[in-house]
Amino acid sequence: MNHYLTPDLCDAYPELVQVLEPMFSNFGGRDSFGGEIVTIKCFEDNSLVKEQAELKGNGKVLVVDGGGSLRCALLGDMIAEKAAKNGWEGLVIYGCIRDVDVIAQTDLGVQALASHPKKTEKRGLGDLNVPVTFAGVTFHPGQYIYADNNGVIISPSPLKMPE
């Protein structure tokens, strides 16, 4: 597991990084995480989040555009544990999560807007690997994302921590 410091990455790569608007909180068991972006666009339906968590995700971060909904949770403990088991580095969710105490103990990076106790409906709706826009940034599959307690940044290519 790599450790990332977003301020250091911003200083080292000012021409490459874009910084997300500061609206996310760190809920996961990892203080920092990063990797190649896989995107999901969904609204109050986490079917695709569950499907992707069940696949191998080594070196990847799931970026979920949940429309900023504060009415239900797109991630809970069971999906988070499955994602960790399958090697995902983390998830950045423009929406809510639940089971926060368990997720805080899970070896997975999780950034989201808030917690909410209600689960989503599973209707099989959503789009995978499409450009998504939130927090002042457009995310494309194959870009790279890095997150820590300071914030979240993206880059068109992988970044190495400065010496």
From Swiss-Prot:
Alphabetized SUPFAM superfamilies for the sequence = RraA-like
Q: How is the cofactor bound?
A: Divalent metal cation.
Kindly list the positions annotated as binding a divalent metal cation: D99
Q: What is its EC number?
A: 4.1.3.17, 4.1.1.112
What cofactor is this protein dependent on?
Answer: a divalent metal cation
Q: Known Gene3D superfamilies for this protein?
A: Ribonuclease E inhibitor RraA/RraA-like
The first-level EC class reads lyase
PANTHER family from the xrefs? Answer: 4-HYDROXY-4-METHYL-2-OXOGLUTARATE ALDOLASE 3-RELATED (PTHR33254), REGULATOR OF RIBONUCLEASE ACTIVITY A (PTHR33254:SF29)
Q: Which family does it belong to?
A: Belongs to the class II aldolase/RraA-like family.
Q: What is this protein called?
A: Putative 4-hydroxy-4-methyl-2-oxoglutarate aldolase
